[in-house]
């Protein structure tokens, strides 16, 4: 029964983790360019394999039950979501799965800056005229420098080539970076941005799909995400119920069946 408690407890832990992941996805179904996280599950080996006991105390029957489950590393779904028209001249939606906008993120505690990537293409000028995301991160040009918009040159807009147009002239270029195998080289890092797991492996994209006056919608589907969360909740509750049943059986085995008359 103790072994059964261990198996059920592992199921509770894994499914509550999945609940947290799906809850975060559900909270971001309206976030521009959001990419959903996908929890992973891996089989845990039986106790006799994971922690071999001396003198051959393995139990063949228990080994057949397995060792429960572990939470595996989470992955991110980078599939491009449908674009949505906004009519805003500085909005831009990327349509390729592996392209991103480069932004400069400043640590508020240390002042250190880091280049990160985002799919959120809702841009606007800040008080200094620099092009920023809705979270205040500086949008970078192909030279990794911030883009400044001169208000004296007229209204600015982004064209399909990622150029900032004022009047009839291109005054700047938005950096569009391509990342090979983004699922393994990028990790979510808050504020709808992605950081590199290791080396900065982005490449300047020379050809890419970009829709002006659009934004990419969230990659999290409200219906499917809600169904996933419900399934994880049911699985967690089922394992918790098994823990209660086994606890009751242990109580009776010790206090009732094991009572000495």
Language-model segments: which ranges?
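Amphipathic alpha-helical polymerization modules
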Residues: 1-261
């Amino acid at each position: 029964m103790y072994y059964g408690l261990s198996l059920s407890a592992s199921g509770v832990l894994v499914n509550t983790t999945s609940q947290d992941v799906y809850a975060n996805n559900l909270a971001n179904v309206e976030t521009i360019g959001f990419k959903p996280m996908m929890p992973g599950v891996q089989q845990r080996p039986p106790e006799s394999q994971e922690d071999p006991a001396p003198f051959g105390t393995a139990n063949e029957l228990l080994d057949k039950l397995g060792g429960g489950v572990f939470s595996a590393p989470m992955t991110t779904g980078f599939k491009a979501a449908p674009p949505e028209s906004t009519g805003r001249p500085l909005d831009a939606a990327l349509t390729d799965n592996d392209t991103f906008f480069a932004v400069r993120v400043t640590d508020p505690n240390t002042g250190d800056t880091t280049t990160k990537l985002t799919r959120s293409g809702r841009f606007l000028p800040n008080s200094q005229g620099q092009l920023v995301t809705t979270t205040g991160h500086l949008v970078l040009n192909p030279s990794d420098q911030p883009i400044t918009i001169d208000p004296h040159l007229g209204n600015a807009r982004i064209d399909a080539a990622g150029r900032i147009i004022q009047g009839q002239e291109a005054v700047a270029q938005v950096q569009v970076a391509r990342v090979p195998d983004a699922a393994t080289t990028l990790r979510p890092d808050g504020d709808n941005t992605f950081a590199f797991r290791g080396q900065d492996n982005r490449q300047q994209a020379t050809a890419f799909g970009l829709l002006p006056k659009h934004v990419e919608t969230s990659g999290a589907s409200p219906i499917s995400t809600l169904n996933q969360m419900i399934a994880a909740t049911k699985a967690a509750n089922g394992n918790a119920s098994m823990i209660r049943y086994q606890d009751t059986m242990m109580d009776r085995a010790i206090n009732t069946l094991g009572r000495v008359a």
